[in-house]
């Protein structure tokens, strides 16, 4: 794993105070690789919105583009001169804040390693 996926993990640790890999890689219909069906809860919606955000990125690969950011107070400020990399940073920043803001509705008993048949509905548009 390289580029922004490592940076995304770091942001999640900073803002949500938990590992993105361990908490969000296999959650709901959208957290982790791919995504199908309808978001199952607010945390899964964070991942859906993040996937949509990555889908709108042009001129760089959001999974490998390395961006710059600074930590200020308890937040993240995206920087740099490359508009594409800055957009990737913003996608990650918004998702990490979303995870933080929805920790109280996270339900591992219900949505961790959700069977694929639970994610068969037609997806909503981004």
From Swiss-Prot:
Expressed by the venom gland. The keyword Zinc does not apply. It catalyses: a 1,2-diacyl-sn-glycero-3-phosphocholine + H2O = a 1-acyl-sn-glycero-3-phosphocholine + a fatty acid + H(+). Its EC number is 3.1.1.4. Snake venom phospholipase A2 (PLA2) that inhibits ADP-induced platelet aggregation. PLA2 catalyzes the calcium-dependent hydrolysis of the 2-acyl groups in 3-sn-phosphoglycerides. Keywords: Calcium, Disulfide bond, Hemostasis impairing toxin, Hydrolase, Lipid degradation, Lipid metabolism, Metal-binding, Platelet aggregation inhibiting toxin, Secreted, Signal, Toxin. The keyword Signal applies. The active site is at residues 50, 92. Its cofactor is Ca(2+). This is Acidic phospholipase A2 S1E6-a. It is found in: Secreted. Pfam families: Phospholip_A2_1. CDD domains: PLA2c. GO terms for molecular function: calcium ion binding; calcium-dependent phospholipase A2 activity; phospholipid binding; toxin activity. Binds 1 Ca(2+) ion per subunit. Residues 1-3 form the signal peptide. Ca(2+) binds at residues 30, 32, 34, 51. One of its GO terms (biological process) is arachidonate secretion. SMART domains: PA2c. Belongs to the phospholipase A2 family. Group II subfamily. D49 sub-subfamily. Homodimer. Disulfide bonds join 29-119, 31-47, 46-98, 52-126, 53-91, 60-84, 78-89.
